[in-house]
């Protein structure tokens, strides 16, 4: 599932660019509108998203490019993965204990965990 502080349309464009849109589609995107315009890492927003998609956080890998947004996933029991982002806002709090793993390439990571078929 995609959990974004952006619009669903923006998420669809990014997923298409990354070549993974077919894994998700619009029905698996929870955007800022779905969140009532209350952004991550607000706990109530995370809980609303988890309820909508019937997600058990303890069985979830939470991947995020803004390090501080991983805090709520960690608190709820997710395995957390920071997609390394060199922008100042993206890397703030990237040294915190709530980050389980750090990656540089999302597509490669998805292939490694067998969510994305190799071409």
Sequence positions of predicted segments:
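Conserved phosphate-coupling serine/threonine residues in phosphotransfer and NTP-handling enzymes
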Residues: 4-6
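Asp-based, Mg2+/Mn2+-dependent phosphohydrolase catalytic module
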Residues: 8, 14-119
